[in-house]
């Protein structure tokens, strides 16, 4: 079974969000199950030179884009037993950032066409083409509408994964007409048209044989108006080919037993070493070294989606408790400035690191006691899974993948691995934080809760089995 992942980013090459983690980890897990996965992505100038040096020029072809042919170099390399193809074109991919350019519609129209034009030259018979998010959604659409009659492509099945419905790739109609050479028959509400523009993600949803969302709850949520980003009706229409498969974490990267970034490695039976990580974290940030004061942390993009309006509303009430708070992330200036002001107002309790630091993030996961993730919506979420693996108990809102992976602690049965609240309400969140702090001070309960969190399986194994089953069903 041969699968080709078409992605716009992938660890270890380049990363801007969770898509890169999925693209980097899932193929390795599928390989263990006997599924051959190869990955195709743009050859961005941002890719570290040592990784590009590990690739060789496999082939040079021309890609038809509207009225002109564009250069396409196919570079081939291998990392961790997985074969990668990098699509080389400096005009489109020699940029200082992955996305956010005036010509993104053209850039990813080119990449979508390039993926399809490359397939006969890869020395790899593709059974299933698996595209991800808006950037490669049109690969599946163009395959069905323009390439499927060609004997080289007619057997290929398609899967499309929605990682975040909020970002859809909406562009002026000229992109469809001039670059993708699609006529008026595609510019209506049953096809690519979207409020006077063209919507790439819509194309992926319509044309793919199967669609997955990155958690079962998110799969249900996006069929409702509140979460559906104006595509809820379309997703209800194609509900029969929509499924939800929760993401995992790469346990070769996120594992407190082997993590070289943390001060002391530990497992569920050596939690005293977790306390050493807590002390190291307090020293790093210049916080008082108080073993019995819980550290509440957030490692996040500082955006509205992450529920920061709730945090902002009740932050001073949380500060009335004997807690320490560490924020690591960057994003909207209003949230950055708020947390910097809180660090100024509460210098003995609040520390903020604006930006991202991979090594420090690992130490925050290892050294914290509680991990706050009160998202407005969360397709899957990676932070809560990492926190659980490190025995840092998550406090989450019951949405998307947070609802699927965090079970609220039940004091009657002792079951659960975290704390959760339902409504997007600041005082509901505050009540849940206070409840978590209360149980933190009951050491026997807390130790049991931490052990339960750490002994569950958050790897990609179950997810990979589900994807293998999905691929197999398409080929039967």
Swiss-Prot record:
What Enzyme Commission number does this protein have?
A: 2.4.1.21
Name the positions where ADP-alpha-D-glucose binds. 15
> Which terms are listed as keywords in the entry?
Glycogen biosynthesis, Glycosyltransferase, Transferase
A Gene Ontology MF term for this entry?
alpha-1,4-glucan glucosyltransferase (UDP-glucose donor) activity
Q: Which domain of life is it from?
A: Bacteria
> What catalytic activity is recorded?
[(1->4)-alpha-D-glucosyl](n) + ADP-alpha-D-glucose = [(1->4)-alpha-D-glucosyl](n+1) + ADP + H(+)
Instruction: Reply yes or no: does the keyword Transferase apply.
Output: yes
Q: Name one GO biological process term.
A: glycogen biosynthetic process
Pathway listed for it is: Glycan biosynthesis; glycogen biosynthesis
Which top class of enzyme applies to this chain? transferase
Quote the InterPro entries the UniProt record gives. Glyco_trans_1, GS/SS, Starch_synth_cat_dom
SUPFAM superfamilies linked:
UDP-Glycosyltransferase/glycogen phosphorylase
Q: Does the keyword Glycosyltransferase apply?
A: yes
UniProt xrefs under PANTHER family: ALPHA AMYLASE DOMAIN-CONTAINING PROTEIN, GRANULE-BOUND STARCH SYNTHASE 1, CHLOROPLASTIC/AMYLOPLASTIC
NCBIfam families linked to this entry: glgA (TIGR02095), PRK00654.1-1 (NF001898), PRK00654.1-2 (NF001899)
Q: What does this protein do?
A: Synthesizes alpha-1,4-glucan chains using ADP-glucose.
According to its UniProt record, which protein family does this protein belong to? Belongs to the glycosyltransferase 1 family. Bacterial/plant glycogen synthase subfamily.
Per its record, how is this protein called by name? Glycogen synthase
Q: Which organism is it from?
A: Bacillus anthracis
Q: Gene name?
A: glgA
């Amino acid at each position: 079974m041969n699968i080709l992942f078409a992605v716009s980013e992938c660890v270890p090459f380049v990363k801007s969000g969770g898509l890169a983690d999925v693209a980097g980890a899932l193929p390795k897990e599928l390989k263990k199950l006997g599924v051959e996965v190869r990955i195709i992505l743009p050859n961005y100038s941002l890719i570290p030179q040592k990784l590009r040096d590990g690739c060789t020029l496999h082939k040079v072809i021309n890609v038809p884009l509207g009225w002109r042919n564009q250069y396409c170099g196919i570079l081939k390399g291998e990392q961790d037993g997985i074969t990668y193809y990098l699509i080389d074109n400096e005009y489109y991919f020699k940029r200082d950032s992955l996305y956010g350019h005036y010509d993104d519609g053209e850039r990813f129209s080119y990449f979508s066409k390039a993926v399809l034009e490359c397939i006969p030259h890869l020395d790899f018979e593709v059974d299933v083409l698996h595209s991800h998010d808006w950037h490669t959604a049109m690969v599946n659409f163009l395959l069905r509408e323009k390439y499927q009659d060609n004997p080289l492509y007619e057997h290929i099945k398609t899967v499309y994964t929605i990682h975040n419905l909020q970002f859809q790739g909406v562009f002026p109609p000229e992109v469809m007409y001039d670059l993708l050479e699609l006529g008026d028959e595609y510019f209506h509400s049953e096809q690519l048209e979207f409020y006077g523009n063209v919507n790439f993600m819509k194309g992926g949803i319509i044309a793919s044989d199967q669609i997955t969302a990155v958690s079962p709850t998110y799969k249900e949520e996006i069929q409702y108006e509140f979460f559906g980003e104006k595509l809820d009706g379309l997703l209800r229409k194609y509900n029969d080919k929509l499924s939800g498969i929760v993401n995992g974490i790469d346990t070769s990267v996120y594992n407190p037993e082997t993590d070289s970034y943390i001060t002391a490695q530990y497992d569920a039976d050596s939690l005293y070493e977790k306390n050493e990580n807590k002390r190291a974290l307090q020293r790093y940030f210049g916080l008082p070294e108080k073993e019995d004061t819980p550290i509440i942390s957030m490692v996040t993009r500082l955006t509205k989606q992450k529920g920061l309006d709730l945090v902002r509303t009740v932050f001073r009430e949380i500060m009335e408790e004997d807690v320490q708070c560490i924020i690591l992330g960057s994003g909207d200036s209003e949230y950055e400035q708020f947390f910097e002001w809180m660090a100024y107002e509460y210098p003995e309790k609040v520390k903020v690191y604006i930006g991202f630091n991979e090594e420090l993030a690992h130490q925050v996961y290892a050294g914290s006691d509680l991990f706050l993730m009160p998202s407005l919506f969360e397709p899957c979420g990676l932070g809560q899974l990492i926190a659980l693996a490190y025995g840092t108990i998550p406090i989450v809102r019951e949405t998307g993948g947070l609802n699927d992976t965090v079970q609220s602690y039940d004091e009657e049965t002792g079951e659960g691995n975290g704390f959760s609240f339902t409504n997007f309400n600041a005082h509901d969140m505050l009540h849940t934080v206070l409840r978590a702090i209360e149980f933190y001070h009951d050491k026997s309960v807390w130790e049991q809760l931490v052990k339960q969190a750490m002994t569950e399986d958050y790897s990609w194994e179950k997810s990979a089995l589900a994807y293998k089953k999905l691929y197999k069903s398409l080929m039967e």
